[in-house]
Amino acid sequence: TTGPRTKQLEKELAEYCHVAKLVCLNSATAAEEMNLRVLGIGEGDEVLVPAYTYTATAAAAIHVGATVKFIDSRKDSLEMDYDQMERAITERTKAVIPVDLGGIPCDYDRIYQAVEGKKALFCPKGDVQEALGRVAVVADCAHGLGASRHGVPTGALADFTSFSFHAVKNFTTAEGGASAWRTLPGLDDEEL
């Protein structure tokens, strides 16, 4: 349910994450799916997902009709292999979903280097993809609220971010989740 305290939480978490907008949902999975739908991702599109993750990360892409391409982990690491991720980007790739395992943010510098380097392959569908002009970075930050990388808090590291407030997470409302996003040029945060 929502009410004035939910709106207050959204406002305070947006400020905490250094983003203009954050909305609460019933789960991180719902937030992840919403992020992909806002991006216009669907049938015929590919979403890159690390092989080492909870099923909900891939399920969100499947729910919108996209094809999931799993990326193996780096040797001796739980993070996805960023070189393999870069090689997997094709003209059908619309998003990569890095997973901030155990509250440790991924190497977003390397992820952005990869998606920027493959911009020429990107075929946008819709206003949001057009505004990005490249593969979207849609973070699964279910365990990462409160973490930061190079002084940038989770929520502001990726284009779109999902958080979980499940009972076992570091910030909990017993259930629930949220979606945060960075402001995109030419798009209204309130309309998104």
Regions found by a protein language model. Give the residues of each.
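PLP-dependent aminotransferase-like
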Residues: 37-141, 148
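Glycine-rich phosphate-binding loop at the start of an alpha helix
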Residues: 25, 29, 55, 79-82, ...
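Short loop-beta-helix segment that forms the pyridoxal 5′-phosphate
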Residues: 6, 10-37, 45-53, 71-73
